Amino acid sequence: MIQLKNISLSYQKPVLKDLQIQVKRGEILGLVGKSGAGKSSLLKICAGLQDPDTGEIYIDGSKQTPVRHLLVPGYHGIAIVNQDFKLDPFHSVEENIREAILHWPYAKRDKRVKKLLNLFGLNDCSLTKAHLISGGQQQRVAIARAIADQPQYLLLDEPFGHLDAHLRQKLSKYLMDLRDEENTGIILVSHEGQDVLGLCDHICILQNGKLSKKYSPENVYYHYKAPDRARLFGPLNTIKINDAIVHFRPDEYILSEAGITVTFQNALFVGGLYLNYVRTELNEQVLLYAFQKLTAIKAIEIRKK
């Protein structure tokens, strides 16, 4: 288990404030926060690439001090893929992965490379030079190379940043397979909460230098006490009913004669569903998901999860 205790870090201003975090093998933990929240710095501290101002790091119960000298990526079974990862552009996909385990016996090394090519869907481009493949394929090669030496933990900084929706879905599957097949603990940083909802076992939110407790994906999605935080994970409606302010997700409603009346304005087809833009009688805009466009005027009843 990677465990961080009382971690604080400042540059010109405090970035991380007395944080606690832990991730076990076989767990995918998502770290979500806005750009500039300190997520990348926290990931580097986990990897031993940066010292905190204060705090302690434990790997499988063993305290690591000083961090940067002892906690070298790979040395304690930790691998990291930064946002600005680099491949050898003139080596093939297979060679880029193979170079990470040149110290392995040949037969074992060859078997491992073949497994990773298959796991990450890279068989078709295995002999292609790295600079000739797509950004999504390069991302998968970088992750395959990072885990080639069978690290116990994998740290990923914004792995979905330059991928389209289809490739994001495929990468999510590869990471879940990695967790399930090799019992790898994964910490995944993202500023887009929707990227981690269907992937992570637990999610923590980094905001104003503080790290939240671990939430399940369902709990964090339907937790509205902090609307700004909730909006990190998808559209959130806010309307006034009588004297109460009500928050609800676009899927938390039914068509009902007993509900409030809304007027249809526009609709976008997104991911197999229509995102309907409607307005309430108080002229508040509301987003509603449906399998079809809503008609001009409907009554909706909010059903809280």
Spell out what each predicted region is.
Residues 129-133, 137:
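Conserved ABC ATPase signature
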Residues 68, 86, 91-110, 119:
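ABC-type ATPase nucleotide-binding domains, specifically the catalytic core motifs of the NBD
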Residues 245-305:
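Non-catalytic connector elements of ABC transporters
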Residues 47:
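Helix-to-loop junction immediately C-terminal to a conserved catalytic motif
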Residues 64-79, 103, 220:
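ABC ATPase NBD coupling module
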Residues 148-152:
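A short, proline-enriched helix->beta-strand linker immediately N-terminal to the Walker B motif
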Residues 108-125, 177:
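Conserved ABC ATPase "signature" region
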